From Swiss-Prot:
Residues 76-98, 113-122 have a biased composition (Basic and acidic residues). Component of a Polycomb group (PcG) multiprotein PRC1-like complex, a complex class required to maintain the transcriptionally repressive state of many genes, including Hox genes, throughout development. PcG PRC1-like complex acts via chromatin remodeling and modification of histones; it mediates monoubiquitination of histone H2A 'Lys-119', rendering chromatin heritably changed in its expressibility. Component of a PRC1-like complex that mediates monoubiquitination of histone H2A 'Lys-119' on the X chromosome and is required for normal silencing of one copy of the X chromosome in XX females. It holds the Pfam family Zn_ribbon_RanBP. InterPro entries: RYBP/YAF2 (IPR039958), YAF2_RYBP (IPR033774), Znf_RanBP2 (IPR001876), Znf_RanBP2_sf (IPR036443). SUPFAM superfamilies: Ran binding protein zinc finger-like (SSF90209). Residues 143-226 are annotated as: Interaction with GABPB1 and FANK1. It comes from Homo sapiens (Human). Transmembrane segments: none annotated. It comes from the Eukaryota. There is a cross-link at K77 (Glycyl lysine isopeptide (Lys-Gly) (interchain with G-Cter in SUMO2)). This is RING1 and YY1-binding protein. Coiled coil: none annotated.
Amino acid sequence: MTMGDKKSPTRPKRQAKPAADEGFWDCSVCTFRNSAEAFKCSICDVRKGTSTRKPRINSQLVAQQVAQQYATPPPPKKEKKEKVEKQDKEKPEKDKEISPSVTKKNTNKKTKPKSDILKDPPSEANSIQSANATTKTSETNHTSRPRLKNVDRSTAQQLAVTVGNVTVIITDFKEKTRSSSTSSSTVTSSAGSEQQNQSSSGSESTDKGSSRSSTPKGDMSAVNDESF
C-alpha cells in the first residue's frame, strides 16, 4: 500500500460553538444583557430596540409650521365671500325663471266681469264691520254687574282678616230703611180700605132702616084720616 492510499481515521468534525453574544441584547438605558426571548428589559422594563438618542430640532421646519398655523385661518373667509357672490348671481337667474311662469298664469286667468267692479269697494264693507264690532264692544262694556238695591252704601264697615300672608277685607252693609216705611204704608192702606168698606156697609144699613120706618107712619096717617 502506498502512502496515498492510507485513509485518515474517521473522527467527528468539531461543531462550531455558539458565540457567547448570539441572541443576547444589551439594554440601551441600563446596559443590562437580556436573553433573546425577553422583549423587555428585566430591570428597567424598557422595550427592545428603543434608542436614547435625542432628536435634533430643525429651526427652519419649526418656523414653517408656525407660519402655516397662523396663516391658515384667512382662506375660509375668501371661500365664504365666493359662496355669497355665487348665491347673489343665482338669485337673478331664478327670478328670471320664475317671472315667465307667473306671466303665463296671469294670462290664463279669465277677466272679471264689469258687474264685480261696480260692486261696493271692500273698504266700505270693512268699515261697516268695524262699526258693528265697536257697537258690540261698547254694549258689552256698558253692561254693569248686578248690584243689590236694598243695601245702604253709606253704612259700610270693613273688617280685615289676616291668615298667614293673605289679608282679606270684608265689608258689611246695612239694609235700607225704605223697606220698613213701605211695609207701614201697605198696612195703613189696607186699614183704610177696611174702614171704607165698613162705612159703606153702615150707610147701606141706615138707608134700609129709614125706609122701613117711613112706611108704617104713612099707613097710620091714612087710617086716622079715614076715621075722622
